[in-house]
Amino acid sequence: MAAAMVAAVHGVGRQDRSSPGGGGAPQVDTGKYVRYTPEQVEALERVYGECPKPSSLRRQQLIRECPILSNIEPKQIKVWFQNRRCREKQRKEASRLQTVNRKLTAMNKLLMEENDRLQKQVSRLVYENGYMRQQLHNPSVATTDTSCESVVTSGQHHQQQNPAATRPQRDANNPAGLLAIAEETLAEFLSKATGTAVDWVQMVGMKPGPDSIGIIAVSHNCSGVAARACGLVSLEPTKVAEILKDRPSWYRDCRCVDVLHVIPTGNGGTIELIYMQTYAPTTLAAPRDFWILRYTSGLEDGSLVICERSLTQSTGGPSGPNTPNFVRAEVLPSGYLIRPCEGGGSMIHIVDHVDLDAWSVPEVLRPLYESPKILAQKMTIAALRHIRQIAHESSGEMPYGGGRQPAVLRTFSQRLSRGFNDAVNGFPDDGWSLMSSDGAEDVTIAFNSSPNKLVGSHVNSSQLFSAIGGGILCAKASMLLQNVPPALLVRFLREHRSEWADPGVDAYSAAALRASPYAVPGLRAGGFMGSQVILPLAHTLEHEEFLEVIRLEGHSLCHDEVVLSRDMYLLQLCSGVDENAAGACAQLVFAPIDESFADDAPLLPSGFRVIPLDGKTDAPSATRTLDLASTLEVGSGGTTRASSDTSSTCNTRSVLTIAFQFSYENHLRESVAAMARQYVRTVVASVQRVAMAIAPSRLGGQIETKNPPGSPEAHTLARWIGRSYRFHTGADLLRTDSQSTDSSLKAMWQHSDSIMCCSLKAAPVFTFANQAGLDMLETTLIALQDISLEKILDDDGRKALCTEFPKIMQQGFAYLPGGVCVSSMGRPVSYEQAVAWKVLSDDDTPHCLAFMFVNWSFV
């Protein structure tokens, strides 16, 4: 520990090098190094723990306060702190590299196992191909061969998915019989997780790597639908098992999981009999329930296994509960294989294999229950993402949004999602009842006169439901959409709330949170609605879901000659906005909140859910080049690049579900119902208009769209940025071999430094950023325009910009000193230097300001 107690730092004069415990240290030139005593090091370390980068005044104060440092010059102390920070940075970097190395080693092992499995699958397919050729030459011969893991008879390939069909009858109503079922389930699950019992096809875009989610595959030509995932997480197997067993915490479609019986086994495992209910994703289908045997056991190699299957007449076993209005679905052998990794962490294999009884739903909705990609997104990938999220939060690297712990924010997300699912399904046992319709069947109205039963005892509902009596009313509808990508539609609805929302209805919902709500509003064709400000709270690791607060500013509405002018707030959850995520459900759910935003605040979620219906095609859908960079303003009508193959975007279908909830007082229930019914019809009409406007832009550019004045296309802006930088500084910003606008856009988008553009206004807001800029701000192009330049700069940065601003406007550019700024999530970001320059349009008029932050990194 001599190195920890005795520090050598660069100095300017000779100092005494003698110190206790330093006898074993190498001799050094006294003209270059200063030897500190352990007492001096202890004093410096104490200050370093409080302030790693003390100012000059603080260092001088330190010398005055600590007499033992009086023989050391302030400059030498400055160097000591510099070296100490360097050692700390090196230690963190070494630790990070060790972690990455462990991840790569484990991932390499996983890939080798996957390669072995694929080689077995290829060998089997080669064998079966030869057999099929033989059958074609000898059609009269029918042979059964079971030498491989499949059975081929008369040219038909039947996988052994249901050995229970040939299992002899046995008594499974006792622990021994249940253990036999459990052991068979374990063997079948392992053959799917690590063997070739199912033909797995890797999902497009899911590539492995040290920071990737893992290997994701879906089933091909098997009974039911199945999905498989392999990944690495930095949690121990027992913690992973605990998280996975808590299915409602990560499976958003799970309504409840009731463990009815727990039976210990002789090998140290447990058998559980579980009744589970899941929500229906839309109002057009019934919810599902499951009667499941779950078996938890350890393997000889130290792995932990959780496997499960449904108990049916063919498997035997006790009968489960029967609940009206639910369709009984089946879990085929599925589960989780959790293997410990050297150095900590776990390697997880997940298999989800279900038969959702697709024939019980209308034909147009069957892809919802027949698509393995939808299953993968909802269950398999969701489980892996949730575990990685918990691991990331446990590491302490997760920034807190609004001063709240990540677990609290995650609870808000779960409550929003669950509340929306409750509204869509309207279960009678939660207190929901249908109201009589007005003759049309397009909008369903349900009411709940026992809202406390619905929102739960942990929520303070006294503000929401007055003492004079009241409840919750829900208006909901579902519709089919053609040629509208779900992610694109939800992004538009999120960014352009004024296109579909009525400010009077928003005000009514917000007033319900206050002591004296006013009368039910009438719908207006127009009305003053102020700007919408998006305040980020939290997002998941891969930004597939984000929680935010929406502030609706500047409302001015008249109700009974009372003028209201007050900001309103919504808690909003947005997910599934990545157009490249096959089978992903896009959702926008929001609920009014008050300024206090308490942890137990009551939430009445409303919103939209769009689910793709065409899950059978395996071909990747055509996407725009540089999709995020293809338009400067979301919904601004950016030109879409024509695709040579539009067949994948034509004839795509999705189902849209809309549900809006309102509180009511008993004497106003009919009035609120009439308002809600009309409002949902108005929203449906608005969404249909939006869908018609969006759909043509995805059909190979067959219909030209024009950008609003002042909103150039992305490649035009890239050309302006590069040309203006070269004009002002004489240097090339974008080094490309080609002079085409596409290459300029690509070069700017992939530039390693953060490049951003902001408006030339009194309060500049960002209008565009390249990928590095979005990463630095921890945002997306959708939310970028809600971030102002002033918010990300610290005091020193703002002072430097104000000082150099006249120079920027006169000379066209200026260099700003390095410093620290703040991302949208509140994380500090350091940069070595910043460059600001004036971006000129083709007619040499100022269009915007561009900033480049050089060599930025999170602190």
UniProtKB/Swiss-Prot annotation:
Keywords: Coiled coil, DNA-binding, Homeobox, Nucleus, Transcription, Transcription regulation. GO terms for cellular component: nucleus. Transmembrane segments: none annotated. This is Homeobox-leucine zipper protein HOX32. Expressed in seedlings, roots, stems, leaf sheaths and blades and panicles. Gene3D superfamilies: 3.30.530.20, Homeodomain-like. Residues 171-393 form the START domain.
